[in-house]
Structures are given as structure tokens and as C-alpha cells.
Amino acid sequence: MVKPLVSYGSVMSGVGGEGVPSALAILASWGWTFDTPNHESGISPDTTPADSIRGAAVASPDQPLHGGPEREATAPSFSPTRADDGPPCTDGPYVTFDTLFMVSSIDELGRRQLTDTIRKDLRLSLAKFSIACTKTSSFSGNAPRHHRRGAFQRGTRAPRSNKSLQMFVLCKRTHAARVREQLRVVIQSRKPRKYYTRSSDGRLCPAVPVFVHEFVSSEPMRLHRDNVMLASGAE
């Protein structure tokens, strides 16, 4: 079972027939189970409750990554045997991880440049850690993507954009704080005018909302060494 521990932002939920389903909802439809924080009245949303309920997806949005206080994830309940400062546990040709970050953006008109930039930065800045980054995946609705030039007159509403991009980063729990901080740095340092997003009324805005969700696994996740960015000096 995978438990979401930190949610710096939310993933857009589908609205109507042309909406984009959230990545968490899609994972839930594949059989993934999540523990959703249950914030009772009088409890600060910045406090992670001890008890949680099981649900299919995040029920309410949190603050975006670039706003609001940061909440650190708690350590997992299991403690696999491994060296704290060395590479993740290995099982033959496989490398073991226990923490996963999901980085997603919605309505990005810069195609995959944003997540590609994040991946390149992590490869360089976290070279002394063994991590794994997936390629960018995309989810889209059934609405038509292309329209004739000038088909929408001034003042008319353009169709809602329907693209969601996400990538996943796997790391060792003891390195999660460094990965979390580096994600924050690279996302906040992006140039606003390089990426654009389309709002529901069809207008372009020089910003792309980026959301980061952190998960910890109750069981080890194994990847083949060929798919891992091994730490510098690791054999």
C-alpha cells in the first residue's frame, strides 16, 4: 500500500465530459489505495493527523507549491536494513526505493519543457544520490485539440484545455528531504515567461501551476539498475 504523506498542491479533477481526471483518480481506478488526511474542525491543515481514512483520491485542494507553509512527511513504519549514507538497498541487478514524488502540471502550453527541466536539474544536483525519474506521461480528454485559425471571435469562450502532464521521482527515504527541497528550488526558479497556461476563459497566463505529491511505500519498490540514476562512484 502506498500512503500520500505530503501534498503541496492538488491535481485538477475532471469537470463535465471534457474535464481532465486527476492522476490520483486514475491511479485509484487501477487499484491503488490511498490514505487521505482527515482534518477535523479546530485542527490546523498544516498538521498531519495521526488517523486517516482510506479513499480513492484527494478530496479537497491544498495550497500550491509556491505558497503556504511546507509540511514534511513522517518516516515510514518499516525500517529496512541498509546503510544511511550509501546507495539504496540492492537485490541483485535491482535497486530498492521506498519514497515516490509525483510532479504534475496542468494546461501547460510549453509541452514537456517544464518536467524535462526538472529531470535534468535533479540529475545534476542530486548526482551523489541514487534516484529514478520516469519520463513525462500525459492524460487528456476527448475534446478536439485543433481549431481553425480565427474560429473563436473576440469575447467568445475557447474550449477548456484538457492536458495534464506528470512525472515520478523515486528515492531513498533518508534522501527525501533533499529531493523535496531541490524540487522546490527548481520549480520556483523557472522563468515565468517561458511557460504559459490557458485558463478556463481561454486567456493565456505567464505561469504554469506545478503540484508535488509525496508518497511512502509500506513495501520496497525495486527497479532494475539500468533504469536508475546511480550515485556518483556507485558500482
From Swiss-Prot:
One of its GO terms (cellular component) is host cell nucleus. Pfam families: Herpes_UL3. It is found in: Host nucleus. Phosphorylated. Residues 38-89, 138-157 are annotated as: Disordered. Keywords: Host nucleus, Phosphoprotein. The keyword Cytoplasm does not apply. Transmembrane segments: none annotated. Residues 38-50 have a biased composition (Polar residues). InterPro entries: Herpes_UL3. The keyword Protein biosynthesis does not apply. Its main location: host cell. Belongs to the alphaherpesvirinae HHV-1 UL3 family. This is Nuclear phosphoprotein UL3. It comes from Human herpesvirus 1 (strain F) (HHV-1).
